[in-house]
A protein has these predicted regions:
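Glycine-rich, basic loop-to-helix element that forms the pyrophosphate-binding segment
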Residues: 63-79
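Short, flexible, basic/aromatic active-site loop/helix in glycosyltransferases
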Residues: 135-166
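N-proximal low-complexity "stem/linker" segments adjacent to membrane-targeting elements
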Residues: 1-26
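Short aromatic/hydrophobic "clamp" motif used to bind/position activated sugar donors
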Residues: 84
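A short, conserved alpha-helix in the catalytic core of glycosyltransferases
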Residues: 167-185, 190-222
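Non-catalytic, C-terminal membrane-associated alpha-helical segments of glycosyltransferases
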Residues: 237-244, 258-333
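Acidic donor-binding segment of Leloir-type glycosyltransferases
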Residues: 22-62
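Conserved donor NDP-sugar-binding/catalytic core segment of glycosyltransferases
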Residues: 96-141
């Protein structure tokens, strides 16, 4: 295991935001020891060419199996660095991002994940403002260390430990202790596939780390900014996708071995299934930022999420086998 931070960006055919993200990493006050771009099932050579021509110090690899968590696991295998700091291609890292991450992990070997404060890069459009009003990726100004701080109230409510999987950060800026995550089996490749499950890999690994007895630190000194989607429909779809993926992840957790107790998982799953209805009532009273039609769709998405994980596992296996088959044909041919 090599000391230091590898900053990893998983991307697919998005050269313009990727260029901006890479520039933010090149401008760190304490630069990461390594910067890695994982090009996930690209449609052409544009990303590879851009990295080669404009960022010669950045390492490029191509992961042929489509799916964000295939790309994340590829990053874990590609680097030998102790810490892998994942950042989405639509994120701009603050100048102290990498250094603050390194400082957090130096506090204790028990810390497996560090998340940070993610603010909006722009609030120019109605879609961006709606996403931020719904909560965005902000998690506040107070440092949180789990499980030590688990008895704090989350959004004013006492909650089970699994609730912190959505209350302590976001995958758009998430750093992990590489060996620990590999020992836990890596990211779940059945999540973040697009349809039927377009998210959930970050929530799943946050929960599995907590359930395994490791620590997570949310440190607002780890600062980044995220470019929210500009159109209202796109922002609403992202919110709905998040809720469907959350329910699928919770349903998976409810039937998986659980060291910290299944009752809290089941209780939180039941609450999240009911919550869109509660929000709809709040909206009718004028107290929820999302329109009523979006909350109705959210409720339906949550219930569909209950049965999505099994289908997503089958899809992940088909994608894996398809790529393996093409490789075997190429070698044999």
């Amino acid at each position: 295991m090599t000391p230091g931070v590898c900053a990893a960006i998983c991307t697919r055919d998005r050269t313009d935001p990727l260029r901006r993200a890479l520039r933010s990493l090149m401008g760190q006050t304490r630069e990461p020891a390594e910067i890695l771009v994982v090009d996930n099932a690209p449609g052409g050579p544009a990303t590879r060419n851009m990295v080669r021509d404009e960022f010669p110090g950045v390492r490029y690899v191509m992961e042929p199996v489509p799916g964000l968590d295939f790309a994340r696991n590829r990053a874990l295998r590609e680097t030998s660095r102790e810490i892998v700091a994942f950042m989405d291609d639509d994120v701009v890292a603050g100048p102290g991002w990498a250094g603050a991450i390194r400082d957090v992990f130096r506090e204790s070997e028990c810390i497996a994940i560090c998340t940070g404060k993610v603010e909006a890069l722009s609030l120019e459009t109605e879609g961006q403002r709606l996403f931020e009003a719904n909560g965005g990726f902000a998690r506040g100004e107070e440092r949180i260390r789990l499980p030590a701080d688990r008895k704090r109230r989350l959004h004013g409510m006492p909650v089970p430990l699994i609730a912190w999987s959505i209350g302590v950060g976001s995958g758009c800026s998430l750093a992990v202790r590489r060996r620990t995550i590999l020992d836990l089996g890596g990211f779940d490749e059945a999540l973040d596939l697009g349809h039927p499950l377009p998210g959930g890999g970050d929530l799943d690994i946050l929960w599995r780390v907590l359930d395994a007895g490791y620590e997570i630190v949310y440190d607002p000194a780890v600062q980044a900014r995220h470019e929210h989607r500009r159109e209202v429909e796109a922002s609403v779809n992202q919110i709905l996708d998040h809720h469907r993926s959350l329910i699928a992840m919770l349903a998976k957790a409810a039937v998986s071995p659980c060291r910290t107790g299944r009752i809290g998982v089941l209780a939180f799953l039941a609450w999240r299934l009911m919550k869109p209805g509660v929000r709809l009532l709040s909206r009718l009273a004028g107290r929820d930022p999302l329109p009523a039609w979006a909350l109705v769709r959210m409720w339906g998405n949550c219930w569909r999420g209950l049965g999505s994980y099994a289908a997503a596992r089958r899809l992940a296996e088909r994608r894996r086998n398809a790529v393996s088959g093409r490789v075997a044909e190429a070698v044999g041919g």
